[in-house]
Amino acid sequence: MARRPRHSIYSSDEDDEDIEMCDHDYDGLLPKSGKRHLGKTRWTREEDEKLKKLVEQNGTDDWKVIANYLPNRTDVQCQHRWQKVLNPELIKGPWTKEEDQRVIELVQKYGPKRWSVIAKHLKGRIGKQCRERWHNHLNPEVKKTSWTEEEDRIIYQAHKRLGNRWAEIAKLLPGRTDNAIKNHWNSTMRRKVEQEGYLQESSKASQPAVTTSFQKNSHLMGFTHAPPSAQLPPAGQPSVNSDYPYYHISEAQNVSSHVPYPVALHVNIVNVPQPAAAAIQRHYNDEDPEKEKRIKELELLLMSTENELKGQQALPTQNHTCSYPGWHSTTIADHTRPHGDSAPVSCLEEHHSTPSLPADPGSLPEESASPARCMIFHQSTILDNVKNLLEFAETLQFIDSFLNTSNNHENLDLEMPSLTSTPLNGHKLTVTTPFHRDQTVKIQKENTIFRTPAIKRSILEGSPRTPTPFKHALTAQEIKYGPLKMLPQTPSHLVEDLQDEIKQESDESGIVAEFQENGQPLLKKIKQEVESPTDKAGNFFCSNHWEGDSLNTQLFTQASPVADMPNILTSSVLMTPVSEDEDNVLKAFTVPKSRSLASPLQPCNGAWESASCGKTDDQMTASGQSRKYVNAFSTRTLVM
């Protein structure tokens, strides 16, 4: 048989002995030829008889020789069949107290993993028998009590989600083995669940009633948790399930004011108390077997929300909205209902005092805490009302930041749901305001949130873009000096080209170019500065790019660093006349000339030289002692 996963600490499987054996399993299919079906069928009576004879003739030392006489059987299969089924010395009866005590002692010595070693100390028992005996009976952590209803419920829900993966289910029930859970399900629970409806009614009662029709939750609603004594508006009746304390306002209830900025928000942000957060966790935890069904219903609700907002160009409210800080009824058109009917829903009634929270937050239905119940509200009304409620300080902060964001982020919560461990497949529709917005439905592809965004071709093929400051500088340059000219590169005549450019700019600006300083050309002086020992990078640049074919003279003359102290940035050749405003700016970047040395170098003082160079009496004595100590040893080669 195929191997089963071994993840539970109470698993009764072992990697070296997984094949279940029976004394006479001769009812299986006949062996099939081919490597694919090698050893996949049960042993026949003829194969067992032949294996017994071969063991009597050849012994149990070389199973490969025996396997040669049994087609479609390997040496390992022959060995396991003999040791676990056909061996006459194998004990298949009940375990004695002495054997149980021996197993306990050996497990304490070798641990609950080395079953082959443990089996060698028990004559007539194999490792699989010892393992199953320990996990099913002798392990002190294994529960031997009767099954409780809570354990049955866990098994029922886990089996609906995982199927016959008993090792995974055993992780949810500490103290129960996968084999015990499997036996309990097959012998008792499956019949009671399938035929008698066991645990099905209690499971439905414990789960929130979100399996209602699409008509009930496919609309935007402004609602609150109404106490049981609240009166429902006469215009309509509650929809499918009376557990919901909110009702839809019929389209006949017309109110006159105008809501300028309708925004879709999650209802639980506004009027769901904090204790209801636990209900949300129970709604959407990973163990919920109806999670997929809930997701589909939320997708349908989002589709309805989009259609309703598209149909609403102006959402009226009552005339005294600005004077009253509370909530008011709004007329919401539902275009998604198949028969045109409108299920009534109650909104918050008008009050001239601060609205009071429900007395019993725990009585709030779990359905009202769903993050997909949305509502339309007035911006100023929301801010004025929420500021009066200290219990909703966090709500105020969220709404204020939400309403002040750009229109591009109004549908952030609906377009970007929280990531789950499994990508959700569905069409998420955007919810936008009906004012100055494109009403085109935006459909997301499957698992779009987990995919790398596509790069536009224009970005890949476009030319490099010039930064804005450079654009302004180039524009000013073109206005002042004319359009830029692209000249061919002439590396061999670089010096001549630079001299021409400097001379041309100097002539245009009215300044005579000074090409000679102390009888030395300026460019040669520049190259000497770059060749200075303080700038090795300039040395590399000049040696590679300033060597011209036409330069036949020695360009790099030996010059002292003091002679090159004036900086080329202060030279008048490179400075063009500028206006007074520009001159003030450029002065900040002008490097001042280096100050010359005040006086020539003077000889050091004798006392200072003796102290700094180690010529004092103490230093001379220490140096002499060190030399004597070192000279006492012979010269040795340093071995690394």
UniProtKB/Swiss-Prot annotation:
<feature type="modified residue" description="Phosphoserine">
    <location>
        <position position="532"/>
    </location>
</feature>
<keyword id="KW-0010">Activator</keyword>
<feature type="domain" description="HTH myb-type 3">
    <location>
        <begin position="143"/>
        <end position="193"/>
    </location>
</feature>
<dbReference type="Pfam" id="PF00249">
    <property type="entry name" value="Myb_DNA-binding"/>
</dbReference>
<feature type="region of interest" description="Transcriptional activation domain">
    <location>
        <begin position="275"/>
        <end position="327"/>
    </location>
</feature>
<dbReference type="Pfam" id="PF09316">
    <property type="entry name" value="Cmyb_C"/>
</dbReference>
<feature type="region of interest" description="Leucine-zipper">
    <location>
        <begin position="375"/>
        <end position="396"/>
    </location>
</feature>
<dbReference type="GO" id="GO:0045944">
    <property type="term" value="P:positive regulation of transcription by RNA polymerase II"/>
</dbReference>
<keyword id="KW-0238">DNA-binding</keyword>
<dbReference type="InterPro" id="IPR009057">
    <property type="entry name" value="Homeodomain-like_sf"/>
</dbReference>
<keyword id="KW-0007">Acetylation</keyword>
<dbReference type="InterPro" id="IPR050560">
    <property type="entry name" value="MYB_TF"/>
</dbReference>
<keyword id="KW-0656">Proto-oncogene</keyword>
<dbReference type="GO" id="GO:0000978">
    <property type="term" value="F:RNA polymerase II cis-regulatory region sequence-specific DNA binding"/>
</dbReference>
<keyword id="KW-0597">Phosphoprotein</keyword>
<dbReference type="InterPro" id="IPR017930">
    <property type="entry name" value="Myb_dom"/>
</dbReference>
<feature type="cross-link" description="Glycyl lysine isopeptide (Lys-Gly) (interchain with G-Cter in SUMO2); alternate">
    <location>
        <position position="480"/>
    </location>
</feature>
<keyword id="KW-0677">Repeat</keyword>
<dbReference type="GO" id="GO:0005634">
    <property type="term" value="C:nucleus"/>
</dbReference>
<comment type="function">
    <text>Transcriptional activator; DNA-binding protein that specifically recognize the sequence 5'-YAAC[GT]G-3'. Plays an important role in the control of proliferation and differentiation of hematopoietic progenitor cells.</text>
</comment>
<feature type="DNA-binding region" description="H-T-H motif">
    <location>
        <begin position="115"/>
        <end position="138"/>
    </location>
</feature>
<comment type="subunit">
    <text>Interacts with HIPK1, HIPK2, MAF and NLK.</text>
</comment>
<keyword id="KW-1017">Isopeptide bond</keyword>
<keyword id="KW-0805">Transcription regulation</keyword>
<feature type="modified residue" description="N6-acetyllysine; alternate">
    <location>
        <position position="480"/>
    </location>
</feature>
<feature type="modified residue" description="N6-acetyllysine">
    <location>
        <position position="471"/>
    </location>
</feature>
<feature type="modified residue" description="Phosphothreonine">
    <location>
        <position position="534"/>
    </location>
</feature>
<dbReference type="InterPro" id="IPR001005">
    <property type="entry name" value="SANT/Myb"/>
</dbReference>
<keyword id="KW-0804">Transcription</keyword>
<dbReference type="Pfam" id="PF07988">
    <property type="entry name" value="LMSTEN"/>
</dbReference>
<keyword id="KW-0539">Nucleus</keyword>
<feature type="cross-link" description="Glycyl lysine isopeptide (Lys-Gly) (interchain with G-Cter in SUMO1)">
    <location>
        <position position="527"/>
    </location>
</feature>
<dbReference type="InterPro" id="IPR012642">
    <property type="entry name" value="Tscrpt_reg_Wos2-domain"/>
</dbReference>
<feature type="region of interest" description="Interaction with HIPK2 and NLK">
    <location>
        <begin position="90"/>
        <end position="193"/>
    </location>
</feature>
<feature type="DNA-binding region" description="H-T-H motif">
    <location>
        <begin position="63"/>
        <end position="86"/>
    </location>
</feature>
<feature type="domain" description="HTH myb-type 1">
    <location>
        <begin position="35"/>
        <end position="86"/>
    </location>
</feature>
<dbReference type="GO" id="GO:0000278">
    <property type="term" value="P:mitotic cell cycle"/>
</dbReference>
<feature type="region of interest" description="Negative regulatory domain">
    <location>
        <begin position="328"/>
        <end position="464"/>
    </location>
</feature>
<dbReference type="InterPro" id="IPR015395">
    <property type="entry name" value="C-myb_C"/>
</dbReference>
<protein>
    <recommendedName>
        <fullName>Transcriptional activator Myb</fullName>
    </recommendedName>
</protein>
<feature type="region of interest" description="Disordered">
    <location>
        <begin position="338"/>
        <end position="368"/>
    </location>
</feature>
<feature type="DNA-binding region" description="H-T-H motif">
    <location>
        <begin position="166"/>
        <end position="189"/>
    </location>
</feature>
